[in-house]
Amino acid sequence: GARQDSLIDIGQQVGFSLEPAADSLKMADSYYQNCGQLEAIHQKLVEQLRANGLLDIYQRIELPLTKVLAAMELNGIKVDQAWLAGLAGEWQTKLAELTQKIYQQAGQDFNINSPKQLQVVLFDDLKLVSKGLSKTKSGPSTDAANLQKLQQQHPIIELIIEYRELSKLLNTYALSLPKLINRDDGRLHANFQQAITATGRLSASEPNLQNIPTKTEIGKKLRQAFITDPGCQLISFDYSQIELRIMASLANEQGMIADFVAGQDIHLATAAKINDIPLDQVSDQQRRAAKAVNFGLLYGQGPHGLAEATGLSYGAAKDFIDQYFVVYPRIAEYMNEAVDQARRLGFAATVWGRRRYLPDLDSPNQAIRRAAERMAINLPIQGTAADIMKAAMIAVDDWLADNFDQRQARLILQIHDEILIEAASEKVDKIIAAVPKLMTDVIDLAVSLAVSTKTGFNWAEL
């Protein structure tokens, strides 16, 4: 799904022979010769974009976005280094306590980080039942999905899950982030990549802040470390259920469109329709199942996945999905049409024409072919969401530049369906009044987009 090419690779793809420097003495001459061909390579690439109907998205989205991302990288995000250091110490102590509790439950000391040793402890020593678990060459896997299934069998499982989450946050963030903080401004300056993922979504590195948990208490504690300059606030603008709105629009599913237009809780409305009951009689379990189906279908989830996500039996999960397609028949038709079109064209495309080529749609291997079919269904939805987000970032950045100087308001992060702005407190109201409309106006869909807004003095408050 991801690829990075060097100038030499790109030149060779369009018929130019560029040579790497053989040694340091020839490096300057090699760079000079290669750079001399940049304009010709550029023209060839533009011709390819035009021939494939991609020139518009390049000129309207990807090219202007480079300026936005460069500014975001320079802006960075402020870090409370004292809080982070305190958190690291607290978590190291907590991790040591968890380690001892796990040893007590196991009746022995062992390397908790070793899947093989953990496998022996759980299934050989503690005799946990492995039926229904995914397997590795050496036996039942101890991955996160299997641990969730084992939770009811032994109290050690919950401790291991907590240990793993805490260990990851400690090592990936609390202990590693201080090494990446710029000493001059006390800020983290991540790298943003706009052309790495196959769907067009942005990715980030050094650090990647997209994987910090949002709902767990320890994840929220870590987010408290991300703060603002004095006199400023963070403002979050988050697209609400953007992929479901795109799916309803692409499928022209009138039932779902009507629920969105009416401002209904879409998961509640889905559960009510599937179970044929009034909205006020929907249980939490029924809403959870509806939510799992609504989002799961975007990624090709079937009855087995729904059963795992909700605790339903396989039969009940299958019935739920079958009834879902009765309630929303155009969703099923859209999924079939998306696969058929991608197979006919050789690629899936977003609303604005971004392509993902899918040669595996014709694979004789069923598993590989099914994976490509899921991509054909998902790319027009997730890829369109990515295009919309990029267009919104450009629109918001332009508006901020027209109305404020860099010290008063600036884009600092884009994560999933959300952008973060750091702004002087006295400018917050003006920004909140303008930005949601900028974000919703970038595209005209059958279902209007919606943006939620939150403010705070650190990331955990959003």
Segments and roles (model prediction):
Residues P230, I242, Q406-R410, Q414-V442:
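Gly/His-enriched, cation/cofactor- and phosphate-binding structural elements
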Residues A2, S6-L18, D23-T214, Q233, ...:
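Conserved "right-hand" nucleotidyltransferase catalytic core of DNA-directed polymerases
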Residues I218-Q233, A401-D405:
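A short acidic-Thr-Gly-centered motif at the start of a beta-strand
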Residues Q119-V120, T199, Q210-I212, I242-R245, ...:
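Flexible loop/turn segments at secondary-structure boundaries
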Residues L74, N182, H189-A190, A195-T197, ...:
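Conserved catalytic core of nucleic-acid polymerases
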Residues M27, L49-G53, I77-A85, F226-L234, ...:
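Glycine- and acidic
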Residues S236, E243-N275, R355-R369:
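Metal-dependent catalytic core segments for phosphate chemistry
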Residues T93-Q100, Q104-I157, V326-R374, N378, ...:
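C-terminal polymerase-core module
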